[in-house]
Amino acid sequence: MKSSVWKLAAMVSLAVGVCGGACAQAQQAAKPRWQMPTVTLVHDAGSQELPREKTQLAETKSKPQSLASLAGDSAVTQGIQAGVNDAAWGVAGHMNSAVGGTAVTQGGSILGGMLASRKPTVTYVWGVPGPASGNILKTTSPKFSVNFAGAPGVNPSDFAPEIVRLTLAQNTCRLIGATRGKEDARSHDAADWEIYSGFVEDRVAANVQKTGEGQYDLSPQSPLYPGEYAVVLRPISKNEKFSGGDVSRGQGAGMMFDTVWTFQVAENAQ
């Protein structure tokens, strides 16, 4: 009798163990491997997730002395308003992929390759269309919870969130930041572009507290003046190299420059 009880107990224990392992595997499988970055506004009444926006990228020959100096450049405002056709950039014209390089070499001979390697340097400007954000805050001291731990193709330890002030350009768009790069940088798949080494932006002094891998609490150190702002994700190292192709396509580490959460501090904010 005791032997039968022991056998039954062993069978139950084995079944529980198998079920436990299977349940754990099922839970792991149900959990998404990738998750797009999120920014949540945290306040006394609860929390509100801000909509994630995609930046537009424009080109100009003007040097980026400041965002204010670029705000009057029609090439910048027109480029951001029209938006960049990322698909066209990936397929046409600026051929620097393996296939494109072969086509250029066959059609343009060695001279064409030499000229291609001497592309002039231009200024790339990131911005968002429209003169104002639809996310209007009534507080001058917002608190945000930022999570990009599951961002696809991104090492979260390489990035941290920031708050930047946006610059209104000709009442048509808001400028986020700018940097220098080769004219064909957006078509390069190789990670050879130090985007952030000379990046121009109006960063706000902020309290940045890491709560986990790719997870942060973020708030300004001082009350914000009324105006246009954004939460952005930036490389911790200014020498981090990026693929211009990834930036154009909004994928991998390049996605971090293409992603923004805008907000407006109202005139009557407290």
Question: Where are the model-predicted features located?
Answer:
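Bacterial N-terminal signal peptides that target proteins for export
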Residues: 1-11
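Short, solvent-exposed loop/turn positions at domain surfaces
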Residues: 130-132, 204, 218
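Generic structural detector for well-ordered beta-strands
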Residues: 207, 217-219, 262-264
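Extended, solvent-exposed segments with strong compositional bias
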Residues: 182-213
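A glycine-anchored, Pro-Gly-centered beta-turn/N-cap motif
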Residues: 214, 220-228, 232
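Bacterial N-terminal signal peptides
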Residues: 9-20
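Primarily secretory-pathway and cell-envelope proteins
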Residues: 25-189, 234-270
